[in-house]
Amino acid sequence: IIWKDIDYMFIDMPPGTGDVALTIMQSIPVQGVVMVSTPQPMVSMIVEKACHMCEKMEVKVLGIIENMAYLECPNCHERIEFYKKEDVETLCNSTCTKLYGTLPMLDLIRDINEYDAYSKEQQEKVDAYISDIATEVLEDIA
């Protein structure tokens, strides 16, 4: 594929340190990687291994986004921590990376592929969760 002049390319890859990640890092000039984790020890371990692989490949890990970090009550919007909060903090410390932010478990995000288009209200709800994270990532790669 030949792309015209582009500023940024985001590639969503499968988790881990498999052939896909290695091939991309060897084939494309990668300026940085944003890892996405969930607050579970096994996932944190996989992300930590991927961070170490990036280090060996001399690819900078910009930071970590914690996905599915908590539930939000639909009535009162109280944040319900389902997993231990320490997992992502330990991961960031062990990989010397920063935490860009956390995202809740949202049915709207879960069902994103089922919508042809978001309503304005749905888009605003998703934007409220990701806009600060996206802004910080873009600032770091600019």
PLM features: residue spans?
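Active-site glycine- and acidic-residue-rich loops that bind
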Residues: P14, P41-I46, E81-F82
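Glycine-rich phosphate-binding loops of nucleotide-dependent enzymes
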Residues: M13, Q26, I133
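Switch II (G3) loop of P-loop NTPases
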Residues: I1-T23
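ATP-dependent NMP and nucleoside kinases share a basic, alpha-helical "lid"
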Residues: T17-G32, P41-M42
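Conserved catalytic network of the ASCE P-loop NTPase/AAA+ motor domain
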Residues: I1-K4, Q26-P29, K56-M57
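Short amphipathic alpha-helical segments
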Residues: L22-M25, V47-E48, H77
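C-terminal lobe/tail of nucleotide-utilizing enzymes
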Residues: M53-A142
